[in-house]
């Protein structure tokens, strides 16, 4: 398989722009779906089926389906609403497992295989504008317990779980969709609280989403953890994570302004150790990012090695779970 196809495997794109159709034929790694893509159950199943048939390589077919305010299929539920992580957890372990099984079965019925959940941030800041009830709790042990139930239930029922948002978004006071939040806590404090749930699942979890956060314990400069070699190396070397490190959405302002061009930002992510990238669109400029990096990687040994390494991880997970 050529280098360009391996690079395409590192990207999960959305439907906006329709560039995904050609990208699938070039080896695109996966697709992500939002509420705007989902109108009826029949229509959505047909969309997913069409994408599968067009793909050169089996794709990750993904969604953010946490429950509560992050629920993409609510328009086709016939009035049913899943509870957010906080309220589901408060109803007890049996309820949490049952709801997770319902979500897994629903996602499978549409042909999906990857859910960007659970959210294992420890919600220590009550004024956090982006996490809140998406977190199981503000208690570390509760978050660890919730993660284990949800991830295991997804895994046992054919859905790949992805924990988020490393190294922990719970103390943030800003929304990374709009800006780059800063968490100014020493590493030992981060380890006791926000990093602890990631440490607890690191050796078992298939995928970790890395946040667009500036954590001063990793980088003094204004660099998000998603582009921080120190942060991603810590995840692997200190916590023992051997799976896929994936970015949060790369069009979020917390990361998008980190380079002169979008391809430069993405290249920084590859060099930092990210294995996959989410772009909520497949506009021509997003496809251009892949093409630009592919061209550069042919003459850049480090970039090429990182792409090869990522491809091995992606292939391994696909072979075992898809």
Regions found by a protein language model. Give the residues of each.
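Divalent metal-dependent hydrolysis catalytic cores, especially in the metallo-beta-lactamase
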Residues: 28-35, 113-119, 273-277
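Glycine-rich, aromatic-flanked loop segments that form ligand/cofactor-binding clefts
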Residues: 54-80, 96-123, 143-167
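A charged helix-plus-loop insertion that forms the helical arch/lid used to bind
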Residues: 77-92, 135-137
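Second-shell residues forming the walls of enzyme active-site clefts
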Residues: 36-52, 59, 69-71, 145-155, ...
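Glycine-rich anion/phosphate-binding loops
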Residues: 39-46, 88-105, 138-145, 188-192
């Amino acid at each position: 398989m050529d280098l360009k196809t391996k690079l395409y495997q590192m990207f999960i794109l959305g439907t906006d722009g329709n560039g995904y159709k050609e990208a699938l034929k070039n080896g695109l790694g996966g697709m992500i779906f939002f509420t705007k893509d989902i109108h009826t159950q029949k229509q959505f199943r047909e969309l997913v089926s069409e994408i599968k048939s067009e793909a050169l390589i089996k794709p990750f077919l993904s969604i953010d389906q946490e429950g509560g305010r992050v629920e993409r299929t609510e328009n086709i539920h016939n009035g049913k609403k899943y509870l957010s992580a906080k309220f589901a957890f408060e109803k007890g372990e049996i309820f949490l497992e049952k709801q997770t099984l319902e979500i897994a079965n629903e996602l499978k019925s549409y042909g999906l295989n990857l859910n960007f959940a659970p959210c294992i941030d420890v919600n220590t800041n009550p004024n956090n504008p982006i996490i809140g009830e998406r977190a199981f709790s503000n208690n570390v042990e509760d978050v660890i317990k919730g993660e284990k139930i949800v991830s295991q239930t997804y895994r046992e029922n054919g859905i790949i779980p992805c924990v988020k948002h490393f190294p922990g978004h719970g103390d943030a006071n800003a929304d990374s969709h709009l800006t780059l939040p800063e968490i100014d806590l020493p590493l030992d404090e981060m380890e006791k609280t926000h990093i602890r749930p990631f440490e607890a699942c690191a050796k078992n979890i298939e995928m970790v989403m890395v946040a667009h956060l500036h954590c001063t314990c990793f980088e003094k400069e204004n660099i998000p953890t998603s582009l921080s070699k120190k942060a991603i190396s810590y995840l692997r070397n200190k916590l023992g994570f051997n799976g896929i490190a994936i970015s949060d959405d790369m069009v979020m302002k917390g990361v998008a302004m980190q380079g002169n061009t979008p391809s430069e930002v993405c290249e920084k992510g590859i060099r930092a150790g990210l294995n996959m990238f989410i772009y909520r669109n497949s506009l021509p400029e997003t496809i251009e990012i892949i093409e630009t990096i592919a061209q550069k990687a042919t003459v850049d040994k480090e970039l090429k090695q990182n792409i090869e390494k990522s491809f091995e991880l992606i292939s391994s997970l696909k072979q075992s779970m898809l």
